Every structure is written in C-alpha cells, then in structure tokens.
C-alpha cells in the first residue's frame, strides 16, 4: 500500500475513534445533566446506550431512571443480567425485591430478600454492603438479620454491635438498642466509653439535670449486674449514672457491694462521701464513713473516716438549724 493511502487510512480510523469518543462523552454529559435535574425520562435514553457499553459503570444510574419512569420490566431484566455478571453482589436481590414491591407482589419481594440473606458471604465487607442495601430501603429487620448472620461468623472479631444498635434506634426499640451497647461492653470492656458516648447521643444527656434522661438504661444495667456480678464494668457504669442523677443512696448501695466484691479498702466510699458532702447529702456521707469505720482500725482510712463522719454530722446539724 502506497504511503499516502496508508496515511489516509490511519487518519480515517483516528477521526472515527475521536468521533466515537466525543459522542460517548457527549452522551455521558447529557445523561448526567438530565439525571441531576431529575429529568429521568430524558436521561434514560442516554443511559440505555451507555449501559450497553459499560454495564457496571452505569447500572445504578440506569436502574434509577427505569424505576423513576416506572419501566419495571426493563429494570427487572437488567438486574437479573447484573446478578449473572456479579453473583456475589447480593445487594442486587434487594433492588430486585424493590421492583416486586412496586409491582405489589409481596411474595416475590420476600423471596428475593430471603435469597439475599441466604447467599451473602458472611464476611465483613459483604455483610456491610447487603445490610446497607436493606437499610437504604428502610427494611431494618432484614438488615439486622444480615448483621446477625455476620455475627455468627465473626463473633470473636467484629460482632456488629454498633450497627445493630443503630438499626434498633431507627426502629424505635430503645430497650434492644441499649442491650446491644451493653453486649458490646460485655464483649470487650474497653468499649465502655464508645458505648457510653453512643448512648448519650441516642437517649439524650443533660449534664445540668442528671445526665441520662431515659430510665431504661438504669433498669437494664441493674439486670446485667444481677446476671453478671463478676462484670464490674456494669456496676461502674451504673454508679456513674447514679452520681450524675444525684441518686446517692443508690450509688452507696452499688459502691458498697462493689467494695465488698473486690475486697477493697473503702476508697470508693470515701470518694462518694466527699461528693455527698459537697451536695449536702450528709446522711449518705455518714453511711459511707460508717462503712469504712466498720472495716476496723487496721484500715488505712479508719481515722480519717471517723473524723469526717463527725464533721458531716456537725454540718447536717448546723444546716438544719440554720437553713
């Protein structure tokens, strides 16, 4: 082939390639413009072409357009195609289930959700993707079921306590939410402060008016203490709440029980007594000091407790005489 003809052929293919690329870029720009404007009836025309060329890249956009334009049959078709291409992407079954829900076919909808949970690989990343797919559709019970399956497989590494707790919160089941956070603390005591922070955010926390506002937390903590007396972290958590709420009688009971269990020297009771005095709860302060005194003269706090008890008694008398 003469050089001149060869150059012409090369130029022809270069121009053709450039033209095709420019057309693709133009289609993509128009598709995204219409999509962002929520003009799905116009966007779907372009995504139809783009999806044929790069199905994985444009699937989500195309699927959304088909749902918004109520072309459920075509949406069903492309999802099934994607499932064949990506059999481990069980979140696609959730999208398929959504189509059946929109078509008022609850049996087929449920079938897809059940299949998704059955086939999901119970590893952290796969579990997250499927659970989030259910959560995006506000199918919280299914999302919880996914995490529970993941928990069975990863119970010693990452049991999904925080994710499940958040879902119970969204469902309005505060008791179940609280118990997930308490399970996290039981699983690993170092989770206390993270769980505490999440509970403060979820239950409401007012430092000026007694800390945690919801009585459910105290109730569930008391149950845990009875069930697991060896887990002192629950007693510490309850004491923290009682002190915040100025429930010093309750705090005295818990501190005394904890001191006995740990065969302590009364340090925690001495600290509570100071807190009681500063809040003018002299009767509870006297109980704290008396408990320490009862440990005997060999206790390092015996003499201090004796003096401080007299001081608390004096303050109580003078305060009641001169309110």
Give the ranges of each region predicted by the language model:
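Acidic, polar-rich low-complexity tracts and alpha-helical solenoid repeat scaffolds
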Residues: 23-323
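Alpha-helical transmembrane segments and their juxtamembrane interfaces
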Residues: 14-15, 284
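Sec/Tat signal peptide C-region and signal peptidase I cleavage site
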Residues: 18-22
């Amino acid at each position: 082939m003469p050089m001149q003809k060869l150059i012409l052929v090369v130029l022809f293919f270069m121009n053709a390639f450039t033209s095709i690329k420019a057309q693709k870029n133009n289609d993509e720009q128009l598709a995204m413009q219409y999509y962002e404007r929520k003009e799905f009836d116009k966007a779907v025309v372009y995504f139809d072409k783009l999806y044929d060329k790069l199905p994985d890249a444009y699937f989500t956009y195309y699927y959304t357009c088909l749902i918004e334009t109520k072309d459920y049959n075509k949406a069903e078709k492309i999802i099934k195609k994607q499932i064949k291409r990506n059999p481990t992407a069980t979140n696609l079954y959730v999208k398929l289930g959504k189509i059946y829900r929109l078509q008022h076919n609850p049996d087929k909808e449920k079938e897809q959700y059940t299949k998704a949970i059955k086939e999901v690989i119970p590893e952290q990343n796969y579990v997250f993707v499927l659970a989030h797919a259910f959560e995006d559709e506000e199918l919280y019970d299914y999302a919880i079921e996914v995490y529970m399956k993941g928990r069975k497989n990863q119970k010693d590494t990452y049991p999904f306590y925080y994710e499940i707790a958040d879902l119970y919160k969204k469902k309005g089941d505060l008791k179940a939410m609280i118990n997930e956070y308490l399970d996290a603390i039981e699983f690993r005591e170092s989770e206390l402060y993270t769980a505490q922070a999440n509970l403060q955010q979820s239950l409401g926390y007012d430092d000026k008016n007694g800390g945690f506002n919801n009585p459910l937390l105290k109730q569930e903590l008391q149950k845990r203490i009875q069930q697991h007396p060896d887990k002192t972290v629950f007693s510490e958590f309850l004491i923290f709440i009682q002190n915040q709420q100025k429930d010093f009688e309750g705090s005295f009971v818990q501190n005394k029980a904890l001191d006995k269990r740990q065969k302590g020297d009364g340090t925690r009771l001495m600290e509570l007594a100071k807190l009681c005095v500063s809040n003018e709860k002299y009767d509870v302060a006297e109980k704290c000091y008396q408990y320490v005194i009862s440990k005997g003269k060999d206790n390092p706090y015996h003499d201090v407790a004796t003096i401080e008890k007299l001081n608390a008694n004096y303050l109580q008398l003078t305060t009641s005489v001169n309110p």
